[in-house]
């Protein structure tokens, strides 16, 4: 795959309580990804940039929340997140983890 495309696939890590528990217990990491990214592209990007073996990728399309801005009602953008399961013995050291 094109390296330029792989740079655009991963938007960043998704940090939440659930993501932290999954990273510790099930060796799964959660990433925000491009809305048009495929499972294969996500797997290739994680393997290339973090130098780990990926065993599976699950993808979820998240609907944007409705929010109020003063008296106006607006909507956040829809986005996509990926649950990446690493092979046994593999680990990703993200900032803030020990």
UniProtKB/Swiss-Prot annotation:
Keywords, comma-separated and alphabetical: Ribonucleoprotein, Ribosomal protein, RNA-binding, rRNA-binding
A GO MF term: rRNA binding
Keyword RNA-binding: yes
Gene Ontology CC: ribonucleoprotein complex; ribosome
Source organism, top-level taxon: Bacteria
Any Pfam family hit: Ribosomal_L23
GO biological process: one example: translation
InterPro entries: Nucleotide-bd_a/b_plait_sf (IPR012677), Ribosomal_uL23-like (IPR013025), Ribosomal_uL23/eL15/eS24_sf (IPR012678)
Family: Belongs to the universal ribosomal protein uL23 family.
Subunit structure: Part of the 50S ribosomal subunit. Contacts protein L29, and trigger factor when it is bound to the ribosome.
Annotated function: One of the early assembly proteins it binds 23S rRNA. One of the proteins that surrounds the polypeptide exit tunnel on the outside of the ribosome. Forms the main docking site for trigger factor binding to the ribosome.
Name by which UniProt lists this protein: Large ribosomal subunit protein uL23
Gene: rplW
């Amino acid at each position: 795959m094109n390296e330029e495309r792989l740079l655009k696939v991963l938007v960043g890590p998704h940090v939440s309580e659930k993501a932290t528990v999954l990273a510790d217990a099930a060796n799964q990491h959660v990433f925000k990804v491009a809305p048009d990214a495929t499972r294969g592209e996500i797997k290739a990007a994680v393997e290339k940039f973090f130098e780990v073996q990926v065993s599976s990728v699950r993808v979820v399309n998240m609907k944007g929340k409705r929010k109020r801005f003063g008296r106006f009602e607006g909507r956040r953008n829809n986005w996509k997140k990926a649950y990446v399961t690493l092979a046994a013995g593999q680990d990703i050291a993200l900032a803030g983890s020990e």
